[in-house]
Amino acid sequence: MAAHQGMAAATAADRFCLPRMAAAAAAASQVENWGDSGVIVSSPFTDDTSTDLDDSADKHHLHALVGGGDGGDDAGEQRGADSSAVSKERRGDQKMQRRLAQNREAARKSRMRKKAYIQQLESSRSKLMHLEQELQRARQQGIFIATGGSGDHGHSIGGNGTLAFDLEYARWLDEHQRHINDLRVALNAQMSDDELCELVDAVMMHYDQVFRLKSFATKSDVFHVLSGMWMSPAERFFMWLGGFRSSELLKVLASHLEPLTDQQLMGICNLQQSSQQAEDALSQGMEALQQTLGDTLVSAAATVVSGGGGADNVTNYMGQMAIAMAKLTTLENFLRQADLLRHQTLQQMHRILTTRQAARALLVISDYFSRLRALSSLWLARPRD
């Protein structure tokens, strides 16, 4: 029974295996026949892959030709970036060139200004040397020696005399400012009265020098001193007979010297009164001089007009002019008396006040005139429409 079943199974297996073997043999025979016929057999999978690769290459080649696709965009962007960089570089170069040109122009203008400034300095130095030479010649000829000497030679040197006076006064003013600065420092430092007294005496002696200087200047050119052209404009506005009014200066000092004793107060009041009276007398004398001088000149002119050009008329004319010249000599006396009044007022003030009060008074006087000079500078520097 078992043997019968095994034979049956083998028969069934053979039945199924024979067809398979036959099919395999047939296939092998077919392959051999195809090989002989020269037909290429390819797998469908192999065909599909080859087709995809060829299409990809073609597309890539096409994109490269037309500039499309991602590669073309990247190349375009790269070219745009390069162009922008070049443009920025060009603009930067242009700005640099403009900046260099501006710097060269500024340097050129600076050199021109420097050259003009140097030329101005050279010109000023030349003028200063010329003035120093004029001053030296004036000193050698015996005029305007502040320490004393004869000023009679001043009459023969009109222009040089006034120039020398202006230079000497400017120098005196600088030295005076140094004296005042020393006095101010000493007063603020609360120095002893003995030390302070030496500085006060130095300032008073310096005032003596300027009055001697003006005396010689008056002999050289009385009208120059009278006009006050050696002073600042604001100082000339308050000027009286070639200088300050003593009575007005005492009014300025009165409010800065307190407290004063009764005796000092009375002395200042009496000094102010006497100064005012002397000023009034000199002013009246000046008015009378102007009147008589004007009348003399009118008489001389009338003589020439009425008498023609005869010898007698010329003689009369010259006589009238000689009288007028003599009256101008009186003008010099008025200026000297006015300076003498100013000088004596300062000396009297010094005697009335204590050392510290006198020091303060000298500072007040100096500051007053300094403010006038500062006002003049501001006025001259004002903008003009």
Swiss-Prot record:
Compartmental location: Nucleus
Entry keyword Membrane: no
Residue span of region Leucine-zipper: 121-135
Domain bZIP: 93-137
Subunit composition and interactions: Interacts with NPR1/NH1, NPR2/NH2 and NPR3/NH3.
Family: Belongs to the bZIP family.
Composition skew (Basic and acidic residues), residue ranges: 87-96
GO biological process entries: defense response; DNA-templated transcription
Coiled-coil boundaries: none
Record-linked PROSITE patterns: BZIP, BZIP_BASIC, DOG1
GO cellular component, one term: nucleus
Listed GO MF terms: DNA-binding transcription factor activity; sequence-specific DNA binding
Keyword Manganese: no
PANTHER family named in the record: TRANSCRIPTION FACTOR PERIANTHIA, TRANSCRIPTION FACTOR TGA9
Region (Disordered), start-end ranges: 62-113
Protein purpose: Transcriptional regulator involved in defense response.
Major subcellular location class: nucleus
Name under which the protein is recorded: Transcription factor TGAL3
Superkingdom, taxonomy of origin: Eukaryota
Organism annotation: Oryza sativa subsp. japonica
Domain DOG1: 162-382
InterPro entries: bZIP, bZIP_sf, TGA_domain
